[in-house]
């Protein structure tokens, strides 16, 4: 019965993705990570606490290396299981910078409930909420020779914007599949700070669907393919196809293909049972390369660890 329920839920998720696929496409208004599969709390609140122990995760991403003012993203996440691992909680702090003049700094909290739907499978339903400070130092922008004033850059913008999201995910010790909307706060309005400033800004819904599987080739080799589908209004749907090969649960090498954008190489090192490092090198088709570093520390010695999907 539980296996039938799990299969039914997964079919509903896939059907919903097909429905929204008709009208929605993806754009890059939300920062994305190449190593998202190792920090899925950042895109799906239902994942918080799924590793069974308190975990600290940090990611630093530098896009378009070598270009002055290139975008950078910093994220720090802490998550843990609660109530005998029937619930999960997480907190994420982040900072996104664009061309030195635009910055988003924020925090959000994630909470989920976990339901056992099969012998090894758990379905999690999660919500998140928080806020970020949207800062635009427009008066610092160099308008170039012969231009000292522009109405679009006449004043700075500094405001607090609420953030809320939702998601669900099914996990067992080999497989996962999840759907999430990282930010359900939608706005489409004029931001007026002074009489001659009329800066237009839009925030659309983003839909994420992700899935992955762990193949045990033998006791020393595991192959872990995964994919991520991103959809929003106003841009083409984007797919990330990823494969990682783990050797002796110690070191991993892999790669990804992001449709219409880039290919990338990844490597991870499980330095200790609690400490993991990762590095990703993005090679976009039309822009300079990008770098991303990842670190996770688990408090596994203080808390007994439960089963979790092996590639997280």
Which role fits each region the language model picked out?
Residues 1-30, 243, 299:
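Bacterial Sec-dependent N-terminal signal peptides
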Residues 28-312:
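Subset of outer-membrane beta-barrel
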């Amino acid at each position: 019965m539980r296996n039938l329920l799990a299969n039914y839920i997964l079919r509903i998720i896939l059907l919903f993705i097909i429905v929204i696929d008709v009208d929605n496409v993806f754009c890059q208004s939300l920062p994305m990570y190449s190593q998202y599969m190792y920090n899925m709390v950042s895109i799906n609140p239902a994942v918080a606490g799924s590793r069974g122990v308190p975990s600290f995760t940090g990611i630093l991403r530098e896009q378009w290396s070598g270009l002055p003012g290139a975008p950078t993203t910093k994220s720090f996440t802490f998550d843990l299981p609660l109530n005998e691992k029937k619930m999960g909680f997480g907190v994420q702090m982040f900072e996104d910078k664009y061309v030195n003049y635009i910055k988003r700094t924020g925090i959000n909290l994630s909470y989920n409930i976990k339901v056992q739907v099969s012998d090894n499978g758990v379905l999690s339903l999660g919500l998140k909420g928080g806020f970020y400070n949207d800062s635009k130092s427009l008066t610092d922008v160099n308008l170039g020779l012969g231009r000292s004033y522009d109405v679009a850059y006449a004043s700075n913008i500094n405001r607090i914007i609420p953030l809320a999201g939702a998601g669900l995910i099914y996990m067992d010790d080999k497989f996962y599949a999840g759907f999430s909307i990282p930010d359900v706060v939608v706005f489409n309005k004029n931001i007026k700070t002074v009489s001659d400033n009329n800066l237009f800004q839009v925030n659309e819904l983003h839909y994420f669907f992700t899935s992955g599987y762990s193949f045990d080739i033998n006791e020393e080799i595991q192959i872990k393919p995964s994919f991520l589908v991103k959809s929003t209004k106003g841009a083409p749907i984007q797919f990330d196809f990823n494969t990682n090969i783990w050797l002796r649960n110690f070191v991993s090498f892999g790669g990804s293909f992001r449709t219409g954008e880039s290919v990338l190489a990844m490597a991870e090192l499980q330095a200790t049972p609690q400490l993991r490092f990762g590095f990703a090198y993005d090679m976009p088709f039309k822009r300079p390369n990008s770098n991303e570093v990842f670190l996770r520390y688990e408090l596994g010695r203080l808390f007994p660890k439960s089963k979790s999907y092996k590639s997280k």
